[in-house]
Amino acid sequence: MPKLVRVPERNVEHAYGVYLLSYEHRLIKRLRRDHQPTIHGQKSWESAYLMMDYLSHHPLPKKGQVMEIGCGWGGISVFCARKYGSKVLAVDLDPAVFPFMNVHSHINAVEIEHRCVDFSKIKGRELGQYQTIVGSDICFWDSLVKPLVNLATRALK
């Protein structure tokens, strides 16, 4: 697993070809004044790096369709768009995470579409449009396991 590389600007991490800002970065601090994520979307979680590592060893098709569920600040979405040229739809239940995701997509020079939706409400027909559906650290409550299993079942039909 590659080490995180600190770049000259404070509170910026570089790993797997993407830049992610820490909770203490000046842009993030500014965003936090107006946007307060409520569903664990207050930072980039370590599990995003684990997923990036996995996807580095199990490459996605170039320019494929990717949906990230529970995207938070969008680290995995940014990685897929940057490394594989994927067209990404980032989905989260908390609308307050999208300004943070937009900053990350901007500093990494990628475009990411996003939508505020409960992943248990996404229809199988829509899920079937994506070659890859990813998510990391999305079962932080026991009550999320069954809806996630149901999502996988709908996606595979």
Regions from the PLM with identified roles:
Residues 1-157:
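S-adenosylmethionine-dependent methyltransferases
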